[in-house]
């Protein structure tokens, strides 16, 4: 976006904020309450005013405080400087903005800006907003509209160092929002005209800050507030305001332009759960617009109000949270009233007597069938709003006229909802046979026996695992792994010759899967039929069998993992949902949960489900630890962050963004694909059990969270991956791709035999006292200019006795920095790919930002990183013999060959690392309880190979490899592969040390655990 467009957008947002405030004051004859810190209307205003004043600053960290002190009276400056909770100039800038709003003097200050352009150019770049005469004039005109609006803002607010407004979780629950404090006249008959005024005067401009930053209503501030003060990017010359003080772009705002807009995760109440939320926060619903929307829907067909129909649509778009709609009734049932579906059956039963009446607010005859549900929405929503009105949330009661046109008194509906009708007449209509029973779950019976709440437990497993026969952009189809496996059938994706033949004959494994799939579908249909019988009969006396089924579903609902049969494709007898555990699950205690709530969670009262240890880049040889955090709103992908913010949120994916989940070959990877495939995230599991555990946890989180059916498909055919792998194997084996059979595919660590053949090397991590391990001249990044240009300087670096010293020059004796590489001060080193200079790497420090260094060549950089990593792992690597470096890679086993290779996950291009013939293997050696094996090769083979040491992720993966090896070897020699135990103590110790190093190294790859595997992560 060009600089002029960015500035125009900022001023447009200010205009909308001011007009919104003016609309309240214009529509009210009584005295309007003062605006306070916690009011949402202040968030919008201060957010955009702060944008305007920050745009183009040369020094963002100082804010505009350095400028406004020249124009501000001495008493005000002293008042701001002595604030106890504001510690930075950026925070003082916003405190000054609050003071100017309190005094209604912001317009006067901007006039001083106009008269002192020379002073402005001292602190702003030339294309700043306040340095543009036209933009500053318009800015001043807009601000003049705030002259008669009363503000009572507290200046001493601790969040001002980080944001121009109060984060949601800072807001006291007992304080009413500005809209709740408005006089009743604003909520009454003037509501429609108020919103119409806002819509007309806004000239059809949306509340869209996507060019600048997400607005305060589009995301929660939880992921930004505790961090270092984030300020707008300084790419003023490029005209792109990529980051703002308000925080990173929210993923929800990226989807506003897509056709199938998703529901905001802010509304986490599942509409299919009967229990309503006890309180509704002001961030979830705005009472003024809730009531006005109902009134507008009731009056939409009146000829006098026809001119406001456009405004009604606009208000709905602005205040409703969009989602993928299955029907009109679903659309109206949930967005503003998450709990209103508890009365849905009553509304449907009431609507049966009015089938012939016109649908409310609908012009298309196609929606006539939905009229019974639609007509009931208005009164039920209004009634529910009045029922939930509490002293903490004053929702004004208003008269609803929509039911009067339909001949049904509102009092009857209220009586029915309050349980004053005969239970035998409740829910008189069964839902259509093609409708999922989750979308039409019954509501509260008037006099329900103390049974389980079956509307909360209906998870409709078939809605989640929609067995897609063909994945997008695939050539051939494959079977779904999540079909329940039969006796003797492997749980992994079939890749044996028999499975390949079945795929060719049955069109992707149809010979195996139809019967279990039909059985599962039949079970779901039978359960749905039982539910229909329950709806048709009196609810107070359901059948005993149905009680057991529904109670079982209810008992399963709170469990983080669903049943094995539903989720992971294994038989029911293999464990209950509560027993589904995996060693990669990280148990979060209260301290860690507090860290997550402060640094990660985006929503108020966001609930944690699972924290799972996974990784990325394994198949490419660039293994990095990743924590996958599942809440009721998002899938968070976490890396190790800076000291001030221990968790770095690499990505937050809303459940409503997920389109489908693709499982890789032999379930070694899981790919999350968002709507329109705009974002894809490949996660390494390297373990079949972990993949199943993750998928079960993901489904459970979505069902209990904000995602509504239909759930994302699970694609398990891995067709494209199979084709790419077959092509690679065919090229290496010099055969046709159709003749390739893959017996095993896994993500492993492999000791390169070329390094092993060189023999053991002395360990450099513990040099003799007084020796210098490494020294030399390097460049280090000294800072970054306001335009983003990096400044690099030379320095002399010495690594001695495990301590890294940085000197300005070779002749200096006083170091600029000294770091104990083996202690808590350092967390490791890694290659830096985001700098301007080549051959750059980072030394990760615990008490300050990373030290970024740059070498003259790739070889020099590799040598430095090797020495630094050895120094960091001093406490892990045993003294004496250092294990050979292990390469994270893919291991592929075919009918006659073994391959180790790297795979580019973007292009599916394979690069071979090592090849061996299966027939050349003479024996396999293992250690009981350890997840590694040694492949011994025959000495009389044509190609003499040293032993291969292969480390896997767990013992179950080792068993899978050994089974595939034995099966392939037996096919060749008709006898079992010789299996021995590792006898030599030195080798056993060496392998175990290497395994320990792998476990700690994949943590240290992102400075996890400060280089100590025994510590909890990121404490």
Swiss-Prot record:
Region of interest (Interaction with sifA), residue spans: 762-885
Q: Which residue ranges have biased composition labelled Polar residues?
A: 243-272, 279-291, 417-427
Question: Which InterPro entries does the record associate with it?
Answer: PH-like_dom_sf (IPR011993), PH_domain (IPR001849), PH_domain-containing_M2 (IPR053015), Run_dom (IPR004012), Run_dom_sf (IPR037213), RUN_PLEKHM2 (IPR047327)
**Variant or mutagenesis effect after changing residue 828 to D:** Loss of interaction with sifA
What topology does it adopt in the membrane? Peripheral membrane protein
Keywords assigned? Acetylation, Cytoplasm, Lysosome, Membrane, Phosphoprotein
Carrying N-acetylmethionine, the residues are 1
> Could you tell me which residue ranges the PH domain spans?
771-873
Outcome, altering residue 830 to D: Loss of interaction with sifA
Stretches for region Interaction with KIF5B: 1-310
Where does the secretion signal sit in this chain?
Answer: none
Protein origin, superkingdom: Eukaryota
Question: Which GO terms are recorded in the biological process aspect for this UniProt protein?
Answer: Golgi organization; lysosome localization; natural killer cell mediated cytotoxicity; regulation of protein localization
**Ranges where the record places region Disordered:** 230-458, 471-525, 557-581
Localized where? Cytoplasm; Lysosome membrane
Q: Could you describe the subunit structure of this protein?
A: Interacts with KLC2 (via TPR repeats). Interacts with KIF5B. Interacts with BORCS5. Interacts (via RUN domain) with ARL8B (GTP-bound form); PLEKHM1 and PLEKHM2 compete for interaction with ARL8B. Interacts with ARL8A. (Microbial infection) Interacts with the S.typhimurium sifA protein; required for S.typhimurium infection.
Q: What is this protein's function?
A: Plays a role in lysosomes movement and localization at the cell periphery acting as an effector of ARL8B. Required for ARL8B to exert its effects on lysosome location, recruits kinesin-1 to lysosomes and hence direct their movement toward microtubule plus ends. Binding to ARL8B provides a link from lysosomal membranes to plus-end-directed motility. Critical factor involved in NK cell-mediated cytotoxicity. Drives the polarization of cytolytic granules and microtubule-organizing centers (MTOCs) toward the immune synapse between effector NK lymphocytes and target cells.
**Protein name, as recorded:** Pleckstrin homology domain-containing family M member 2
State the encoding gene.
Answer: PLEKHM2
